[in-house]
Amino acid sequence: MSNQTSLNEGFVNITTPDGEMECFVAWPAGDDTAAYPPVVLYMDAPGVRGELYDFVRRIAAQGYIAIIPNLYYRYGVRDPGGQMMAMLDAHTNTMIISDTRAIIDWLDAHPNALPGPMGCIGYCMSGKFVLAVT
């Protein structure tokens, strides 16, 4: 990325009813007291990876706190490999709504997340999940 905005970023584990969900989060650095509108990016079927982390960074650089959950955390993997279709088929809207509730709770407690409305972005398999959580 050219003209990079300085970001705070890293991995966090968010507790859900089904276990610890690893998420990558980023937000603008520089003002520790600033709060930013949240955006949740839901992964596509191949799972979380570098290009999706870069997407989170691009969103954050525009003035948001952006987060992407590893929706395959229940299986203990980031890259589903040959299990992708089985893992994809196993996901239900109920599971994703529960995961999203945990993300919202985490954001509500984060000092740099602005309370109120949030954005949701979904691709491929996660488009239907965004419709379920909104």
Where are these regions (language model features)?
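N-terminal cap/leader regions of alpha/beta-hydrolase-fold enzymes
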Residues: 1-134
